[in-house]
Amino acid sequence: MAKAMCSLGACLAVMLVVLAAAVAGVGCSIVSYDGRSLILDGERRIVISGSIHYPRSTPEMWPDLIKKAKEGGLNAIETYVFWNGHEPRRREFNFEGNYDVVRFFKEIQNAGMYAILRIGPYICGEWNYGGLPVWLRDIPGIKFRLHNKPFENGMEAFTTLIVKKMKDANMFAGQGGPIILAQIENEYGYTMLQPENIQSAHEYIHWCADMANKQNVGVPWIMCQQDNDVPPNVVNTCNGFYCHEWFSNRTSIPKMWTENWTGWYRDWDQPEFRRPTEDIAFAVAMFFQMRGSLQNYYMYHGGTNFGRTAGGPYITTSYDYDAPLDEYGNLRQPKYGHLKELHSVLMSMEKILLHGDYIDTNYGDNVTVTKYTLNATSACFINNRFDDRDVNVTLDGTTHFLPAWSVSILPNCKTVAFNSAKIKTQTTVMVNKTSMVEQQTEHFKWSWMPENLRPFMTDEKGNFRKNELLEQIVTTTDQSDYLWYRTSLEHKGEGSYVLYVNTTGHELYAFVNGKLVGQQYSPNENFTFQLKSPNYGGSFELLPAGIVGGPVKLIDSSGSAIDLSNNSWSYKAGLAGEYRKIYLDKPGNKWRSHNSTIPINRPFTWYKTTFQAPAGEDSVVVDLHGLNKGVAWVNGNSLGRYWPSYVAADMPGCHHCDYRGVFKAEVEAQKCLTGCGEPSQQLYHVPRSFLNKGEPNTLILFEEAGGDPSEVAVRTVVEGSVCASAEVGDTVTLSCGAHGRTISSVDVASFGVARGRCGSYDGGCESKVAYDAFAAACVGKESCTVLVTDAFANAGCVSGVLTVQATC
């Protein structure tokens, strides 16, 4: 990820990219490259990749996600390898469940796809501590991502472990496997430019390259976003929203784009960024126009930050990322379909793009025609980089209209096969389905249990003391979000005091004599709160969390302060319920049941209920409306942190999204934002593999701040409305997805300027002929295709574009 994507520290892990063959099956054994592209068994190849992170989904989801990616025209999948997930405690390894990285690669190979193994150790990725295991901090003398033996020894050991696992499974190309590239380090050039680190960084990055090449994997090694000080034995690549202007500083290296950001992550306190489909298509088309040969969508499927894996600060549990496949694995239309059409056109031009001669011709400012020629064939790109005007371009006697901020692709230099701004694919609006399960809500029988605070209010076993305020991550060894600080003083005066705490904690709860006297979340600069460990930067092992150093003061009404920072402090990490693993619902837990009411708005409370799994295969979510802040589990599986009470800022420009112009993931840009004034996240993914079929499922909540579980509901996410626009001569295809849902009605068939957006269109010039045609072809069907003809037009309609909306 880029610098803006991660807030604080360096990140660590392994990133893997998986590349699908353009033909069925894989069999590449010799991998090389030249200045134009990768060369696989002697053939130059275009690679179109997409990121899918295996721990952000489940093994049961992997085959379907990979299948959809391949059907979307990808010939690559990318993923990080997550060190702190695989080695949470030193020399204790986890390669089970959704951390079974070898199984994930085998699923990709089974789909007929190649793989690129990107080994960090740095990943960022909005992942807890950037993928670094926290125990690294305990190694004497360690400095992250600089030239020093403690860090390099740990990095080499983990890199060697991952390489060995891949070799043992015959995953490298020379073994008949899918891996055709490997990466060491990640985005190092973003963070390590401090003057005092230049020499150490230089030695470290060259050590990385040498260490990687000694692994003898038989494929080239890459470094992404490494434009400065590139070692001679690696290939550097580009990351960003746009990479058409980027070229390697060595002409022998092909132009490769390892992270094309399809959207953006979401913070708890911010609206959601939506990168327009037209803009992504524009960026990809421009990249290949300007000699690109490999590009990867980050993300193609974002998934979910289950458990405590969300990085910081403020990253939500959902890692949807506005990707072509949504958090649950559903197609996000039109993004998925429009890019699929682009991929098809690009792959049809593979030979001429990678072997042909080319010439760029400027047609004034911001308009460029690129013509590729090979033997007697030619292919052309025309781009219009103006963000405020359409243009007409005459090429070989034919005039072509280009909307602003768009690229047209002409595989024969005569006929436009694709324009990035003209979307023909349907738009799908997903909705929360009212189902029998949702109707169970009023019948949920809740039981509850107070969190036992006694161990933290007294100096019981497990506590330890220090005459200083300690750093939270080290003290908890990152095994819990919660750290208790306790001190005592003799108060002889009268009157009231204000407790002042300078902390990098995310939320603070204050107790006096065992009673909760207040809680506070502070997003302002007086308190720098964060939800999880930092995950971006250089020497971020030095960046503190918690009430480290303080000060902690009691301030009386006169302004006099008692500084408690150097008092004797007692510490204990975690919750009693965490130690007892209440979330596993073991026998012996003393749940309290109430026939009619349960305590609400009570901090530090556990709740439990049961529900039946919804029928079918639609995506399942739990709606936590009414709750405040905490953690949720289903059948012992952590859904992650929840915070539905945190409402995103309401700001000007929300919901306004003009695709034209440079996309920036900045709230200040006030462009392409949604969810303003709404909960940052209210729905939490429950993968089908978490659920028991035909048996009760247990939902357990730990509510830390006090909420009302009576409004909690289990829902399914399904296609609601499907819409499309097309000109005469085009075909319109509408589909209600792959789970047997059918089109129930046609709502709008307008051959004019339809007002509104998909799901709420108001036809401006209704066409009865078009309506009847779509009703006859579509109602009662899972999908339908209709040819748009002149007969659909109405006299007096201004626009020649048909807009249709149907309900699933």
Swiss-Prot record:
Q: Which PROSITE patterns match?
A: GLYCOSYL_HYDROL_F35, SUEL_LECTIN
The molecular function GO annotations come to: beta-galactosidase activity; carbohydrate binding
Annotated Pfam families: BetaGal_gal-bd, GHD, Glyco_hydro_35, SUEL_Lectin
**EC number in record:** 3.2.1.23
Which Gene Ontology cellular component terms are annotated?
A: apoplast; plant-type cell wall; vacuole
Q: Which UniProt keywords apply?
A: Apoplast, Glycoprotein, Glycosidase, Hydrolase, Secreted, Signal
Which InterPro entries does the UniProt record give? BetaGal_gal-bd, Galactose-bd-like_sf, GHD, Gly_Hdrlase_35_cat, Glyco_hydro_35_CS, Glycoside_Hdrlase_35, Glycoside_hydrolase_SF, Lectin_gal-bd_dom
List, for all copies, the residue spans of the domain called SUEL-type lectin. Answer: 726-808
What is the catalytic activity of this protein?
Hydrolysis of terminal non-reducing beta-D-galactose residues in beta-D-galactosides
Q: Which GO terms describe its biological process?
A: galactose catabolic process; plant-type cell wall modification
Q: Which CDD domains match?
A: Gal_Rha_Lectin_BGal
Q: Which range is the signal sequence, renumbered to this chain?
A: 1-28
Q: Give the record's glycosylation annotations as residue positions.
A: 249, 260, 366, 375, 392, 432, 502, 526, 566, 595
Subcellular location, in the record's words?
A: Secreted, Extracellular space, Apoplast
**Residues annotated as catalytic:** 187 (proton donor), 259 (nucleophile)
For this protein, the record's SUPFAM superfamilies field holds: (Trans)glycosidases (SSF51445), Galactose-binding domain-like (SSF49785)
Q: Which family does it belong to?
A: Belongs to the glycosyl hydrolase 35 family.
Q: Under which name does UniProt file this protein?
A: Beta-galactosidase 14
Q: Which organism is it from?
A: Oryza sativa subsp. japonica
Phylogenetic placement of the source organism = Eukaryota, Viridiplantae, Streptophyta, Embryophyta, Tracheophyta
